[in-house]
Amino acid sequence: MRQAALRTWTILGRVLGVVCLVAIVLSGAVPAEAAESGPFGWPLRPRPTVERRFDKPERNWLPGHRGVDLAGSAGQTVLAAGDGIVVFAGEVAGKPVVSIDHPGGLRTTYEPVTAKVAVGSRVVRGTAIGTLVAGHEGCPAAVCLHWGARRESGAHNRREYVDPLGLLHEVPVRLKPLEP
């Protein structure tokens, strides 16, 4: 009898813990200090919805999605995700783009963004770098920011596309089964 009661309380405690964890995850609550820590942050505020995720191509010339699409609104201010130097502010294939070089061979790109900064400008995380405009095709939202990142490494200046969400150092919550 006593063993059955103990088992019931153990199961009830686990269920309650999972329910609380799920409620926290679904609320999207992130402590302010966690949201603002680390060298990189979100390029849009408030924290945007990720409409399309990173899909690394097998080779740089093959199909894939070399960044993430973040839901925004036309005219919204776009922020530098981290400290760096603006290396490009202009048009690529008719789309306005801003690119920033960061320490360690990292470059982030923001598109379609009308620049408020000039090439050579030093920026810090959170600096307004431009204004989001409509026109990013392939995004399910009416207006999206395409945020990309790539790293140059090695003696041959090899370029590797990386998931910009990985720069945020947010640890995703993963629920594990109670029983193996």
Predicted features and spans:
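Acidic, glycine-rich catalytic/binding loops that coordinate metals and/or anionic ligands
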Residues: 2-6, 35-49, 71, 118-125, ...
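Bacterial N-terminal signal peptides
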Residues: 15-27
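C-terminal region of N-terminal signal peptides and the immediate post-cleavage residues
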Residues: 24-37
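Short glycine/threonine/proline-enriched tight-turn/helix- or strand-capping micro-motif at secondary-structure
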Residues: 49-80
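Short, acidic/hydrophobic/Gly-rich beta-strand patch recurrent on exposed beta strands
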Residues: 68-70, 97-103, 148
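Short, well-structured beta-strand-loop connectors
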Residues: 77-87, 117-134
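Zn2+-dependent peptidoglycan hydrolase active-site motif and core
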Residues: 81-116
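Flexible, gly/ser-rich surface segments that form the specificity/activation loops bordering the active-site cleft
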Residues: 87-91, 96, 127-145, 153
